[in-house]
Amino acid sequence: MSTDNKQSLPAITLAAIGVVYGDIGTSPLYTLRECLSGQFGFGVERDAVFGFLSLIFWLLIFVVSIKYLTFVMRADNAGEGGILTLMSLAGRNTSARTTSMLVIMGLIGGSFFYGEVVITPAISVMSAIEGLEIVAPQLDTWIVPLSIIVLTLLFMIQKHGTAMVGKLFAPIMLTWFLILAGLGLRSIIANQEVLYALNPMWAVHFFLEYKTVSFIALGAVVLSITGVEALYADMGHFGKFPIRLAWFTVVLPSLTLNYFGQGALLLKNPEAIKNPFFLLAPDWALIPLLIIAALATVIASQAVISGVFSLTRQAVRLGYLSPMRIIHTSEMESGQIYIPFVNWMLYVAVVIVIVSFEHSSNLAAAYGIAVTGTMVLTSILSTTVARQNWHWNKYFVALILIAFLCVDIPLFTANLDKLLSGGWLPLSLGTVMFIVMTTWKSERFRLLRRMHEHGNSLEAMIASLEKSPPVRVPGTAVYMSRAINVIPFALMHNLKHNKVLHERVILLTLRTEDAPYVHNVRRVQIEQLSPTFWRVVASYGWRETPNVEEVFHRCGLEGLSCRMMETSFFMSHESLILGKRPWYLRLRGKLYLLLQRNALRAPDQFEIPPNRVIELGTQVEI
């Protein structure tokens, strides 16, 4: 998205603050509290405070500023980012075996996101509502119900779209970051000694003094960079420069000031560890701060929900998830979508998590494994792109990868300590999603191969039909074909059972390209195969939704006139049965049958009028 289009650079930068930095921007609500809460065996001591502050600051510099904003964001596909995009880019110039490994890494990274997305809304909103413990301690029993109410309203408005509400996100988040900076600066001025923690030697001293415990404590430090993947995933919406500009001018200074302000407060008053963020504020500001914190966490949750919608659409379009209903909530912005099934499944999961864990401190124990796991995978995939696509020197790329992994692997390993205390949750959810995605992709491939393994040549069949035509009836018939050079099952069964053929036959294939968008000039390719047969291949990007009516419009512009209400669409509907398999493949087959039964049918998927569709069933053993 170029900054000279439609909006000015300041406007785009402000919008990026409102969407991209919601998650990482609400981390000060709980990060330092979890670091120094006593769970690691040391209390609010000067060396511990300085050590944690130094680690947080330099983690923000190295992971966010250097790794993601400077290096990873160079890897874009027509301006788009995200873990599946990175997977696609990394596999472009590699061997088939290497590509398979990279695809597995990308799918694991995407699955980790699904695991983490359940926790983000819960921990963000709960940590804000927990400000009630400071404002009115007697209301602490209302934290869980209020958190559920807030998130219920958020999930309910998803179907209406967020275009109108979204206009408020940017000014609210800008206000939030200014408040973070103001509260932190006020505390730092009162205790400037805390600025010594900017020296990275305090991080080194922390490890030397606390040894093994300091390593385990990295599991809490990583809370400061949760949401870092959003910087790369949302690159297509705002562009690289506005996201970088927002970070270095607003977000990084505000986060640094607030974390160090909390540290200054704790050095002066160790008892403030119960909630150092809210105790930074004067008494008169607690209620307004509670309100703005709740709004900021709702915005952070919205960004995550929108992110899971986008990831799901991309996975569906790339063939890793079954087709599902995707509703566009904005006529102007193709990225604003609503997926009902995903929305309500996520809502149920979030409510269960809130009721089960009851407090954001308990949830913090579940946070981090998926984030750091994705960071490791991002390092490997992005350096693969640097070597294979950008042709950087292999030794230089190796040094970059080693530098990244020297940070990522200790963070990931430290978070494994959380496995039994809550880390199993995102890991389990991620594992389920990985199984679902790999099952759909592999079983779909098996089905298509089974359907076409005994097929005749398309060209030979057309030549035979032209030479000895069956009864021809007036009108146009469109046969949906998953592959270009194979005979559609529906065509074979129509000839077998009805023994008729329309006077004009179009074989339509809708293809997803390895790009977010396809230009209208390249949308449709038309080839006349015989006097009465045409092949139409319509190409779409993975951020686009195929629409047959649009394809017909493009065909008309290219000289092949088609009228939707005068055309019959023939589609095959496969009734699947499982063949003989080992028990583990049989389980996978049963999962695929379940996914297939609940998948969105082709007429709904491609917006074809139901009264123009003729489905011909066939039984296939897989």
Swiss-Prot record:
Q: Name one Pfam family in it.
A: K_trans_C
**Keyword annotations:** Cell inner membrane, Cell membrane, Ion transport, Membrane, Potassium, Potassium transport, Symport, Transmembrane, Transmembrane helix, Transport
Membrane topology, from the record: Multi-pass membrane protein
Origin: domain of life? Bacteria
Location within or outside the cell = Cell inner membrane
Q: Which reaction does it catalyse?
A: K(+)(in) + H(+)(in) = K(+)(out) + H(+)(out)
Q: Which residues form a coiled coil?
A: none
Please list every transmembrane segment annotated in the UniProt record, as residue ranges: 9-29, 49-69, 103-123, 137-157, 165-185, 213-233, 247-267, 276-296, 337-357, 363-383, 396-416, 419-439
Specify whether Ribosomal protein is a keyword of the entry: no
**Principal subcellular localisation of the protein:** membrane
Q: Which GO terms describe its cellular component?
A: plasma membrane
One GO term in the molecular function aspect is:
symporter activity
What is this protein's function per UniProt? Answer: Responsible for the low-affinity transport of potassium into the cell. Likely operates as a K(+):H(+) symporter.
Belongs to which family? Answer: Belongs to the HAK/KUP transporter (TC 2.A.72) family.
Under what name is this protein listed? Low affinity potassium transport system protein Kup
State the organism of origin.
Escherichia coli O157:H7
Please spell out the taxonomic lineage of the organism that makes this protein. Answer: Bacteria, Pseudomonadati, Pseudomonadota, Gammaproteobacteria, Enterobacterales
